[in-house]
């Protein structure tokens, strides 16, 4: 268990290809780690939909994801729903880079 506020090492920059997403598990919680042209981003690991689909299985286009379970679209950067504003936003988390390493800041 890490101390509160201490960044959690995800991996190395080269571990995640641009335009892709990987699941990252920490303390029994899943996070979706995205590498976009504009940098690294992180959201909760599962969609809020009934299927609770892994967001690491989502389709990515630019800075948006489409849930593989429900088909809803969200901004990866803000977590806001795009095609249905009534939906609950995704939780987003800060990701930092240092010397070729990626860190999740909870």
Residue ranges of predicted features:
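N-terminal pre-ligand scaffold of iron-sulfur
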Residues: 1-60, 92-106
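Short linker/helix segments within small regulatory modules
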Residues: 57-64, 86-87
